[in-house]
Amino acid sequence: GTKNAYDNYYLANPYKQMILSGKVGNKELDDKVRRLLRLAFHTTLNKNRPLGSVASAEHVEAARKIGEEGIVLLQNQNGTLPINLNKTKKIAVIGENAVKMMTVGGGSSSLKVKYETLPLDGIKKRFGKDAEIVFARGYVGDPGGEYNGVVTGQNLKDNRSEKELIDEAVKVAKSADFVVFVGGLNKSEFQDSEGADRKSLSLPYNQDVLISSLAKANKNLAVVLVTGNAVSMPWVKEVPSILQTWYLGSEAGNALASVLAGDANPSGKLPFSFPVKLEDNGAHKLGEFPGNKEEIAAGKGKDKNNPINIKYNEGIFVGYRWHDTKNIKPLFSFGHGLSYTTFEIGKV
């Protein structure tokens, strides 16, 4: 699934089959390739640039390092992370986002990565020689993989009930020395997608219940949140360690594994505040979003020809400005981010 994600992108594979079968010739294909090459040659800054400078080993290393530096360590009680391999011989990886492709993107970007290292793959590569790695799905979110015309090729269909999935995950968690939960959001509709807002600040797909269940099953737990924005965390006091990874790109799995192992010291900081609840944000506290209740009741907002009027009364007091002005304590503050480094202050 991760190697042939774009075989069915628009005309890719169907057109190839038409050429191979002799239904069409290469004339049109050659013309399109010439146009791409012409643009590439005309726009390059260095006409002597050697071939093979796309997705090179240096680019892979840069992608991994960027991923490592973007990870934010939100919480790490009792030094739960990094994983101590002297005490860990079995690691349970739980969660759909551990095996789900996240680099795909359609629309104007038409993003096509050469490869993607998934979290489970990265963890197996880094820890597999020293510990047994086991996996449980935990929840079913988006079993498909089509985003704005790009098809990943993955098929993550699973017909088990939420109870069956959680029961399996808890059983696996109890059998392990350490648990890494990889969850969060994805790029399906009403998640981290364009053209639609999220329906809730909460994690979807029953993940809150799953995380609480895992916390009861194993105290050595790291929650890895793959999201593009804030989520509520009703279980925040139940889990010892939380990593906010965002979407880490093609080296996601290796970057995450490096931080989990302590090969890389997490140094990322939050670019905005995470609220405890939705009403801690000005737009929601003032009652203006998603619009005037009377207008919504009258049927407005259903299409672009019948819009809802929303007045942003909070003005410049958005994010941390609203929290500071109203003395609202966020879940995690703008600029927050821990590391594995410990400090001691001597006599002053």
Question: Model segments located where?
Answer:
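Secreted, periplasmic, or luminal enzymes acting at the cell surface/secretory milieu
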Residues: 5-107, 111-120, 124-130, 134-157, ...
